[in-house]
Amino acid sequence: MFELSPKKAVINDCNKELMNVYKCIKDEKKFEAMCRELNHHETEHSEEYYYEIRNLDRDKRKFNKLADYKRAARTIYLNKACFNGLYRVNSKNEFNVPFGKKTKVNTYDIGNLITVSNYLTMNDIKILNVDFEDSVKDAQKGDFIYFDPPYDSETSIFNSYTEDGFGKEEQRRLAKVYKELSNKGCYVMLSNNNTTLI
């Protein structure tokens, strides 16, 4: 999307923490606070510190009271410091990827983040955290829509980007929505495995 740089767009994902990152990057004060927090994470980085930050979501009441910018910095830090940059949660929506064994971690490229922040703030960009079907309900002929769901796989059951997962039924529902949008005259694109399911 950033390569195309549309003046008006909707960004949607079922991952609440990811969408919070985008919202913080779009908000100047939260963006600055998030960068300070990322610097702190880089300074404190160790295996013990990683698990301390990772386990913040075990106490839901406390975690839900964390400032948005702290949650955003946590998401970015965990992504950079965890094993293989994997995002995975369990059925309780707790991030559960092990430490990535890096002794030093670079959590962000300030130039890149400033470019993204400027793009999000200078254009009409809506950031949503809703079901994919709800995110496209107002789509009109000529709109370009890109879907990037967890890939369907015959050999892997991993789809735990959220506590609810994204299974076979969601894949079928997405295929139906895709066809409806295409029939409406939208330009629709989807990334997935070459699967017999859909």
Regions flagged by a language model, labelled:
Residues F2-S5, K137-A139, I198:
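Short loop/helix-cap segments at secondary-structure boundaries that form the rim of catalytic
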Residues K7-K8, M122-I125, S182-V188:
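Short active-site oxyanion
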Residues Y22, I76, V188:
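A residue-level signal for conserved active-site and pocket-lining positions in enzyme catalytic cores
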Residues D27-Y146, P150-N159, R173, K179, ...:
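SAM-dependent nucleic-acid methyltransferase catalytic core
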Residues S160-G165:
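Short glycine-enriched, charge-decorated loop/helix-capping segments at active-site entrances
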Residues G167-E169:
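Charged helix-capping and loop-helix junction motifs
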Residues Q171-I198:
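Conserved Class I SAM-dependent methyltransferase catalytic core
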